[in-house]
A protein has these predicted regions:
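Acidic-enriched, low-complexity/disordered segments with a strong bias for Aspartate over Glutamate
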Residues: 12, 16, 70, 104, ...
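Active-site-proximal beta-strand elements of phosphoester/diester hydrolases
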Residues: 38-46, 89-94, 122
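Short, surface-exposed beta-strand-loop junctions and turns on beta-sheet-rich folds
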Residues: 47-48, 97, 127-130
Length: 134
C-alpha cells in the first residue's frame, strides 16, 4: 500500500489520509518478549528485498532459522503456515480479510499461538463473497 504500486489506492478520495500517515509512521517490524520468549512480528520478511512472498513450499522459508527469535509471525501471502524452522516457530495466520485460494477453495483464517506450549491453533471461517467449495 505504501509502495509505488499502492499510489492509486492512497490517492483515492475514500482513503483516510490520517490512516495513511499513521501507517507510514509504523516500523517495518516489531519485537517484544512474551514470558521470556522473543517474538518478531513482520508483514513479509526481515531480510532484503522486503516484500518477498514466502509460501509454505518456498525454499526461502529456511531463512527464518537465521532470525534471532523464538517465534516469527508474518503474513503477506495470506497462506496459513505453522512450522518450526531450526529453533524458530514460524507462523503465518493466513488472512481474515482477503482470502487465500488453496487449490480447492477460498480460505479465510486466523491463528492462536500458545507461547507456553508452542502450539498453534488454526481457525478457518467462510467468506460469504465466495461460494462454498471443497
Amino acid at each position: 500500500f505504501l509502495s509505488s504500486a499502492g499510489a492509486r489506492a492512497r490517492e483515492d478520495k475514500k482513503t483516510d489520509r490520517e490512516l495513511v500517515k499513521w501507517l507510514a509512521e509504523q516500523p517495518l517490524q516489531r519485537e517484544f518478549l512474551v514470558g521470556g520468549k522473543k517474538v518478531l512480528m513482520i508483514h513479509s520478511t526481515p531480510w532484503e528485498p522486503r516484500g518477498s512472498y514466502i509460501f509454505p513450499h518456498s525454499e526461502q522459508l529456511e531463512r527464518f532459522a537465521e532470525v534471532e527469535a523464538d517465534f516469527v509471525l508474518y503474513g503477506h501471502t495470506h497462506a496459513h503456515l505453522a512450522r518450526r524452522v531450526g529453533g524458530v516457530l514460524v507462523v503465518n495466520p493466513g488472512a481474515a480479510g482477503e482470502p487465500y485460494y488453496n487449490g480447492d477453495a477460498w480460505r479465510l483464517s486466523s491463528a492462536i499461538l500458545d507461547t507456553v506450549t508452542e502450539e498453534v491453533k488454526r481457525i478457518d471461517f467462510p467468506d460469504s463473497r465466495y461460494p462454498a467449495t471443497a
